[in-house]
Amino acid sequence: MPNLYLVSLGCNKNLVDSEIMLGRLSSYNIVDKPNNADVMIVNTCGFIESAKEESVRTILELASYKKENSVLVVTGCLMQRYRDELMKELPEVDIFTGVGDYASIDEMILKKQNLFSPGVYLQKSDTKRVITGSSYHAYIKIAEGCNQKCSFCAIPTFKGKLKSRDINSIIKEVKELTKDGYSDFSFIAQDTSSFLRDAGINDGLIKLIDEVEKIEAVKSARILYLYPTTASMGLIDKIIASPKFVNYFDMPIQHINDDMLKIMRRGSSKERLKELLTKMRVAPKSFLRTGIIIGHPGETGERFDELCDFLTEFKFDRISAFAYSKEEGTLAYEMEQIPSKTITKRLNTIEKIIKKQIEGSFKSLVGEVIKVQINGSSSEGEMFFGAKSIIWDREIDGEILINDTQIKDPKVGEIYDCKINEFVKDKLIGEIICNS
């Protein structure tokens, strides 16, 4: 059996594509090091400059491990976006492919053939996946592409317009995964709240929630990547009322100043954002995550200060901050740019605010009893089990450490009542009270 080594870079949407490729390559032995791999695959990210640089570094690193008759495959967003340039500049690569042919990866390797189908690959209900990183949680991609026209984002130029999966296809996938023991699901897309708008249906997520709630084996679920102009009050109400979907609200705002929101072509206003966020915040046991961009063209010192003030006053649980990246094919590319030193200085300022906000969110749980799921061994070694709040996403929201002597027969994915005792060095420490 030949050995396969795969590196998945970028977002969890890329991870799903990688898992689809692993499903097509089930006849290979998956290895965790490239040294003895017969086939190496890099699923690249092409979103911002730092991601592009990481992708190229990874490709060149894996090329150094090539042996006689081994195959190096490069796929994903970077490849789709810079097809001609990369094929010319990377002679080390044996097979090039973009974002439309993940389900044909086995044939490409067999024939040692490049393949670039028009459009993106849209997952089908019978698509096989090898879920990685968890035995109880899975990401479910509900759409591809994006109809938004944000000034800074190049994704629509290589992913195309919104293409939603059929609800029946999604529900069939979830049902099949529950048969394999999966009970916790995160629904993802570039803009989840636009789901089914390409079919003329507004609030398609409400229809999806209705169907997921009928699946008894689903214990918990959440929706990531809401977009401010397509996330309705009705959708928020539906999530709050749902017995399956937790009150997890992930909505990147990118900025709060009205002038900046117009320049960035976000389609929303400060007033509308505050209205949505407040409704999310006051929901019982709600968890709010957002993302912001620092240094976009047009961001004056005064506009940046307004963002800082808002992030200081409004209580988010998690905030991801990104330095603006000048990307070809975007409106912002042609705008007057802000000096990199200014962007770095502003990013350092905002990160101090974020650190304080996140610490406050963690500390608010000390003394509380919350429901957690066991992930397995912790990042701190064998003395602790790692767990997460049932509300949190699997990978990005943190870890709760639990002494391994407190659970006689721990089951990964099992839900427990946990009392949070301490917050130490970005980690919560808790004790299991009972099986929930």
UniProtKB/Swiss-Prot annotation:
Start and end residues of each MTTase N-terminal domain: 2-114
The protein's required cofactors: [4Fe-4S] cluster
Main location, first listed in the record: cytoplasm
GO biological process annotation, one example: tRNA modification
Main enzyme class: transferase
Keywords: 4Fe-4S, Cytoplasm, Iron, Iron-sulfur, Metal-binding, S-adenosyl-L-methionine, Transferase
Listed EC numbers: 2.8.4.4
Transmembrane segments: none
Residues involved in [4Fe-4S] cluster 2 binding: 146, 150, 153
Cofactor: how bound: Binds 2 [4Fe-4S] clusters. One cluster is coordinated with 3 cysteines and an exchangeable S-adenosyl-L-methionine.
InterPro entries given in the database record: Elp3/MiaA/NifB-like_rSAM, Methylthiotransferase, Methylthiotransferase_CS, Methylthiotransferase_N, Methylthiotransferase_N_sf, Ribosomal_uS12_MeSTrfase_RimO, rSAM, rSAM_horseshoe
Xref: CDD domains: Radical_SAM
Gene3D superfamilies, per database record: Methylthiotransferase, N-terminal domain, tm_1862 like domain
GO terms, molecular function: 4 iron, 4 sulfur cluster binding; aspartic acid methylthiotransferase activity; metal ion binding; protein methylthiotransferase activity
Annotated residues for binding of [4Fe-4S] cluster 1: 11, 45, 77
Function as written in the Swiss-Prot or TrEMBL entry: Catalyzes the methylthiolation of an aspartic acid residue of ribosomal protein uS12.
Family annotation (NCBIfam families): 30S ribosomal protein S12 methylthiotransferase RimO, MiaB/RimO family radical SAM methylthiotransferase
Similarity-based family: Belongs to the methylthiotransferase family. RimO subfamily.
Protein name: Ribosomal protein uS12 methylthiotransferase RimO
Upper lineage: Bacteria, Pseudomonadati, Campylobacterota, Epsilonproteobacteria, Campylobacterales
